[in-house]
């Protein structure tokens, strides 16, 4: 029990001691905390005082900056105001000066207006006075001259007109002479350029062709038994065949280039083949004629292509090819037309014209010469008619007419063709007048024979001293053939001038053909 009590007492004492100790420690901690709190409070108070002091300084600086900006802006505005005020003052002075000038001008204008009015009135008075004096002078002049005013005017105007005409004529004549001199220089230059730039071939047609043969024995075969082959050849081909002592040569003579060319080819084929007989001659003649017709078309197409032309009707192209077998005064018609085409193109180009159109007109200017005697009219009219029919360019038609003076040249291209034609035809040696007159005479003889009814063909041979006429046996009998020969001879005598005499031979042949089957 006692032990228990002692233990309790010890525990109470321990508890009390612990309480006292804890209280003491607690009091010590409180004092420390209190001191710390006081220190913090002082620090906060110091910071607050420092912040307040800084705030006062910032406010003072802000007030100072604001005042400074205000002062600067005020000073600037005052300066701008002063500048604008000065400017307005100057403008006001200018306006005042202008107003004064305007007022002065107005006063001067009013004064001038008044003076002008006075002057105008004085002018009217002077005009009236002048008019009166003029009328009085006219009356005096009329009385002195015995003329009315209108008559006097007419006399004066007539004299003025005569003088003016004389002056104008002198000036016109002067400029015309200058223009002609310049034109002549220009034309000479252009023609010189054209002739120097074009180098064409010279083509003079002959009246004979020569066929070379390997040996003279062939001459006998060509003549044939009793001359049958050579007679058939001359009748079918329409040419003179001259077989003489000239070695290795047979001469074909005809004024017709086309017939002569066909005859040359036929005899060459006969000589090459060796079969020379009448039937073979006729077959070859038909075949070669067809080949020549085809070659004529091809020749025309080649010419058109070489000249760079297009859209030419095939019939006109064929006529161009036929010009190869036509001649004028000994000059080949196709060579002449080509020469004219090239020269006309060069001349037109130099003058600022259409070179292609000039070439077209040049190649077609003598196209009428390609037509045979069956068509009536001059080659100019025939050529123009053909070109109109196939709707050729109007310049081409004008050139056809103009190159023989039937019309005036209406374009540069037509004039170029006329000049080129003159250059080609009129140059020395280009044509032979005597030959042309002979060819025309022979052609006229053939045409007289062909004009008779019932005549199939007619050929002038022996240099025009003989004409062989092939009659249609169904239309002309033997008795009528004699009469036809006499009629032809009489018409030749009356219409053709020729030396010596002309033999007229009318040949009538009847053939009966049948086939054994």
Swiss-Prot record:
The UniProt keywords, alphabetically, are: Cell membrane, Endonuclease, Hydrolase, Membrane, Nuclease, RNA-binding, Transmembrane, Transmembrane helix
Q: What class of enzyme is it?
A: hydrolase
Give disulfide pairs as residue numbers: none
Predominant place of localization: membrane
SMART domains assigned to the protein according to its UniProt record, in alphabetical order: HDc
Q: Which GO terms describe its cellular component?
A: plasma membrane
Q: Per the database record, which ranges form the KH domain?
A: 207-273
Under the heading InterPro entries, the entry gives: HD/PDEase_dom, HD_domain, HDIG_dom, KH_dom_type_1_sf, Ribonuclease_Y, RNase_Y_N
List where the protein spans the membrane.
Answer: 1-21
Bilayer topology = Single-pass membrane protein
- Outline the extent of the HD domain: 333-426
Localization annotation: Cell membrane
> What family does the database annotate?
Belongs to the RNase Y family.
Described by its record, this protein's role is as follows: Endoribonuclease that initiates mRNA decay.
> What protein name applies here?
Ribonuclease Y
Organism (species): Campylobacter concisus (strain 13826)
Q: What is the lineage of its organism?
A: Bacteria, Pseudomonadati, Campylobacterota, Epsilonproteobacteria, Campylobacterales
């Amino acid at each position: 029990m006692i032990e228990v009590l002692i233990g309790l007492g010890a525990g109470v004492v321990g508890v009390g001691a612990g309480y006292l100790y804890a209280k003491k420690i607690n009091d010590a901690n409180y004092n420390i905390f209190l001191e710390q709190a006081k220190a913090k409070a002082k620090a906060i108070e110091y910071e607050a005082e420092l912040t307040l002091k800084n705030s006062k300084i910032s406010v003072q600086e802000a007030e100072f900056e604001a005042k400074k900006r205000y002062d600067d802006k005020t000073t600037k505005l005052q300066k701008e105001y002063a500048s604008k005020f000065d400017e307005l003052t100057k403008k006001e002075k200018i306006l005042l000066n202008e107003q004064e000038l305007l007022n002065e001008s107005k006063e001067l204008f009013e004064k001038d207006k008044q003076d002008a009015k006075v002057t105008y009135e004085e002018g009217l008075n002077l005009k009236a006075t002048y008019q009166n004096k003029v009328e009085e002078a006219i009356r005096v002049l009329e009385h002195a001259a015995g003329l009315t005013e209108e008559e006097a005017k007419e006399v004066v105007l007539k004299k003025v007109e005569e003088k003016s005409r004389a002056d104008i004529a002198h000036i016109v004549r002067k400029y015309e002479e200058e223009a002609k001199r310049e034109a002549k220089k220009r034309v000479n230059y252009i023609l010189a350029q054209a002739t120097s730039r074009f180098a064409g071939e010279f083509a003079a047609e002959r009246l004979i062709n020569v066929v070379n043969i390997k040996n003279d024995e062939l001459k006998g075969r060509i003549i044939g038994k009793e001359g049958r082959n050579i007679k058939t050849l001359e009748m079918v081909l329409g040419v003179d065949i001259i077989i003489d002592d000239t070695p290795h040569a047979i001469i074909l003579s005809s004024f017709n280039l086309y017939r002569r060319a066909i005859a040359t080819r036929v005899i060459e084929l006969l000589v090459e083949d060796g079969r020379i007989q009448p039937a073979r001659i006729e077959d070859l003649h038909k075949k070669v004629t067809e080949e020549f017709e085809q070659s004529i078309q091809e020749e025309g197409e080649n010419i058109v292509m070489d000249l760079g032309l297009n859209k030419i009707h095939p019939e006109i192209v064929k006529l161009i090819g036929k010009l190869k077998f036509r001649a004028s005064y000994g000059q080949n018609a196709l060579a002449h037309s080509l020469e004219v085409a090239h020269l006309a193109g060069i001349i037109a180009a130099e003058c600022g014209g259409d070179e292609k159109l000039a070439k077209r007109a040049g190649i077609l200017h003598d196209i009428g010469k390609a037509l045979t005697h069956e068509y009536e009219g001059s080659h100019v009219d025939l050529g123009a008619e053909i070109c109109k029919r196939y709707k050729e360019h109007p310049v081409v038609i004008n050139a056809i007419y103009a190159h023989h003076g039937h019309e005036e040249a209406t374009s540069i291209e037509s004039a170029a063709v006329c000049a080129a034609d003159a250059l080609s035809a009129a140059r020395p040696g280009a044509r032979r007048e005597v030959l042309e007159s002979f060819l025309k005479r022979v052609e006229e003889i053939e045409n007289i024979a062909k004009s008779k009814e019932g005549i199939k063909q007619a050929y002038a041979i022996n240099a025009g001293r003989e004409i062989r006429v092939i009659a249609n046996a169904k239309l002309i009998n033997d008795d009528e053939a004699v009469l036809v020969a006499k009629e032809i001879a009489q018409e030749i005598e009356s219409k053709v001038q020729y030396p010596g005499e002309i033999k007229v031979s009318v040949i009538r042949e009847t053939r009966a053909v049948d086939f054994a089957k």
